[in-house]
Amino acid sequence: MKTSEWIDISQPLNNDIATWPGDTPFSYEVSWPKEESGSVNVGKLTMSIHTGTHIDAPFHFDNEGKKVIDLDIQVYVGPVRIIDVSNLESIGKKELENFNLEGVERLLLRTSSHGKVNEFPDVIPHLHADIAPFLSEKGIRLIGVDVPSVDPLDDKELEAHHQLFKHGIHILENVVLDHVADGDYELIALPLALTDADGSPVRAVIRPI
């Protein structure tokens, strides 16, 4: 692979992809086939915003929070560092203190805890709320994880979500990192221009720098 090639770190979206229990299942179908239209196939997509690789907006957990269209899209494009934090049940300031994060603006955490896009996990590693001020002090503006949430799956307080955005840190979830090495990359993970949404699916890609 050439170093200039982009590497996809997104979960493929298809009718078998796992969704949050109780949330809208993913569905794609050709609703207007070429045989009927005379010229084209037209598809219909039904999905939850939080299926597959996606970003969260504050409106997801705060009725007064910013929606996707209000977010700074510059945060989702630029240099990123991938680090390995596998075999940890939770990740906070203590777990990251020994990593060199100087000059890092975007950080992706490889937990290698699940990896089965067609099965929703029962338990995931989660982030401690104290990670937010720690990352903010380092100048980090985006945190990404390879699991569906930065908080425990059964948590209702979503303290990590709240503290991350309180400290100016954007959230990217469900990236796929098992096929890429630790190190520095360029990231593109742009959300759609959804005016009223609490999140957005993204096509997240990286390339070495």
Swiss-Prot record:
Pfam families: Cyclase. It comes from the Bacteria. The keyword Hydrolase applies. Its EC number is 3.5.1.9. Binds 2 zinc ions per subunit. The keyword Chaperone does not apply. Substrate binds at W20. Its cofactor is Zn(2+). The active site is at H60. One of its GO terms (molecular function) is arylformamidase activity. One of its GO terms (biological process) is L-tryptophan catabolic process to kynurenine. Zn(2+) 1 binds at H50, H54, D56, E173. It is an enzyme of class 3 (hydrolase). InterPro entries: KFase/CYL (IPR007325), KFase_sf (IPR037175), Kynurenine_formamidase_bac (IPR017484). SUPFAM superfamilies: Putative cyclase. Keywords: Hydrolase, Metal-binding, Tryptophan catabolism, Zinc. Zn(2+) 2 binds at D56, H161, E173. It catalyses: N-formyl-L-kynurenine + H2O = L-kynurenine + formate + H(+). Pathway: Amino-acid degradation; L-tryptophan degradation via kynurenine pathway; L-kynurenine from L-tryptophan: step 2/2. Belongs to the Cyclase 1 superfamily. KynB family. Homodimer. PANTHER family: CYCLASE-LIKE PROTEIN 2 (PTHR31118), KYNURENINE FORMAMIDASE (PTHR31118:SF32). Catalyzes the hydrolysis of N-formyl-L-kynurenine to L-kynurenine, the second step in the kynurenine pathway of tryptophan degradation. This is Kynurenine formamidase. It comes from Bacillus cereus (strain ATCC 10987 / NRS 248). The gene is kynB.
